[in-house]
């Protein structure tokens, strides 16, 4: 079934409530999962759908789903008869390539996607295919969410609901507890052209970021962030972030090891997609570490994505 035919065959979604109408139209996300993450009732895709289905339906979130992930959902009787679930062809038939196009705007305005959930397995050969790399790059270029892990996918639906105006208590105690950063470590990384944006982001959301139990950063970015913190009244001489090496000298790999050890639960990584990067292998190593720890780690890859995340979490009062 193509996306167009699925739209014709399914009933119109119910009207949105007042808090849902705070979103400018129904948000549209691509949905993809590697084989590991879509196979079986305990797969990451199935876990995400079971946990998120009620909110997805309330939000009217449109899920433009590459074929195998679509079929896996129906096999597990998840999102059955949901009018916002649309099927694209399988990956080998161009489904993933179509998602890349639609992140860039698609061929018609109605096809454009607002972001992508792509549950990635770092040892799946297709994770290095050009279309997979292009999808992430286009998301970063256009400031749209690219969500590659189960932890991130669960969190992002909560963020969408909070930004839409849902009262935090209506998320439930489990979601609010998972969103609480008080026992988490945050990594902050920015390429040279994005360092000023990282400092600006940290300044705008300093109180939220200070709620994390601890923060780490690569070398130069960490130095700038500590200077910011001291200017904001953080105790003099006490680092706000723990600095590791700069990216080209191995800082990305050091943070990757923290992620693999379960000692870092969130990475905010402001990438510059427009320049060649000498330490590209190190960057991919760090990203793939996040995917490996996907049940407990999430990553925000652009200033726009991070700003939306912060907007949602700042609606939750610290415990």
Q: Where in this protein do the model-derived segments appear?
A:
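Active-site rim loops that border cofactor/substrate pockets in soluble metabolic enzymes
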Residues: 75-102, 227-255
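Short internal beta-strands
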Residues: 59-73, 212-225
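Mid-chain, well-packed structural core segment of small domains
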Residues: 95-135, 249-284
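Glycine-rich, charge-decorated loop segments at or immediately adjacent to ligand/cofactor-binding or catalytic sites
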Residues: 72-76, 151-165, 225-228, 301-318
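Conserved beta-alpha
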Residues: 85, 150-158, 163-185, 192-193, ...
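Short, acidic/small-residue loops that bind anionic groups at enzyme active sites
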Residues: 132-157, 285-309
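General beta-strand structural signal in soluble alpha/beta enzymes
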Residues: 31, 63-66, 86-89, 118, ...
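N-terminal phosphate-binding or glycine-rich loops at protein starts, especially the Walker A/P-loop
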Residues: 18-62, 182-213
């Amino acid at each position: 079934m193509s996306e167009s035919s699925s739209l014709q065959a399914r009933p119109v979604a119910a009207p949105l409530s007042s808090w849902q109408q705070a979103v400018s139209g129904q948000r549209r996300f691509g949905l993809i999962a590697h084989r590991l993450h879509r196979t079986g009732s305990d797969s990451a895709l199935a876990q995400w759908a079971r946990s998120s289905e009620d909110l997805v339906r309330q939000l009217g979130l449109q899920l433009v789903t590459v074929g195998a992930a679509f079929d896996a959902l129906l096999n597990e009787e998840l999102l059955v008869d949901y009018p916002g679930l649309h099927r694209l062809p399988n990956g080998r038939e161009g489904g993933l390539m179509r998602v890349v196009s639609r992140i860039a705007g698609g061929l018609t305005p109605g096809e454009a996607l607002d972001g992508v959930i792509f549950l990635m397995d770092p040892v799946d050969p297709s994770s290095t295919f050009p279309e997979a790399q292009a999808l992430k790059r286009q998301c970063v270029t256009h400031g749209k969410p690219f969500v590659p892990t189960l932890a991130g996918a669960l969190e992002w639906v909560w963020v969408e609901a909070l930004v839409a105006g849902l009262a935090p208590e209506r998320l439930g105690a489990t979601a609010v507890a998972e969103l609480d950063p008080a026992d988490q470590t945050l990594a902050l990384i920015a390429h040279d052209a994005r360092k000023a944006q990282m400092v600006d982001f940290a300044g705008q959301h300093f109180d939220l970021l200070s709620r994390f139990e601890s923060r780490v950063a690569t070398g130069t970015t960490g130095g700038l962030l500590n200077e910011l913190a001291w200017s904001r009244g953080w105790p003099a001489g006490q680092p706000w972030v723990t600095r590791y090496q700069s990216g080209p000298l191995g800082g990305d790999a050091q943070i990757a090891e923290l992620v693999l050890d379960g000692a870092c639960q969130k990475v905010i990584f402001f990438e510059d997609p427009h320049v060649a990067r000498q330490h590209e292998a190190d960057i991919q190593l760090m990203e793939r570490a996040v995917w490996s720890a996907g049940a407990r780690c999430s990553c925000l890859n652009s200033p726009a994505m991070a700003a939306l995340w912060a907007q949602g979490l700042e609606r939750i009062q610290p415990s």
